[in-house]
Amino acid sequence: MGYTSYSSFSRSVRAASAGYATKSASDIFTQSKERKIHESMEPSKALLRESRDSDAHPNSIPIIIALDTTGSMLDIPMHLVREGLPKMVGNIIQKGFPDPQILFLGVGDHECDRAPLQVGQFESGDEELDLWLTRTYLERGGGGNGGESYLLAHYFAANHTVMDCLEKRGQKGILVTIGDEAGLHSLPKRSIQEIMGKEVQGSYSDDNL
């Protein structure tokens, strides 16, 4: 993944055609109407995500954007799809990272939600990034347990990604978690296994991630 390039012009034309500026969240993020995670973003089917160099992007830098999909955070995905994502990609390139590869994660609450983790792909192209962003299920869940499962983003980044920037250049990738709650401090082994569909060695917490 990540072999195409970002075109602000083509993105602008496509956004106008798709009606991003005027449509509602449920019309843009269509999984909200389905009320379920898109099968391509099931974490049990995303046991490894790769960020690789290519002729088009010889110095790839992986960037994970973890979006809180609970009820209070609806405005962030809407801002990204309407204007924030093109500006963000442009700013990243202007700051000296010409080959960004962005992966969207949806993060909720593993104690309450049906889809506490959703996983896209590392992409560079405007069309592909829009696809994964708008495919995210805005579950609008969460509970009164004092936090959300932002640790799931950290767990996935640490255990289920491979990247040429690290293997070839010793450079770490970037993880950005966007939320408005405290993070739950632990991920029980049983919860991780249920979400990822595989055996894991143990629980995870703030201290060992």
Model-derived segments and spans:
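Acidic, low-complexity intrinsically disordered regions
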Residues: 1-209
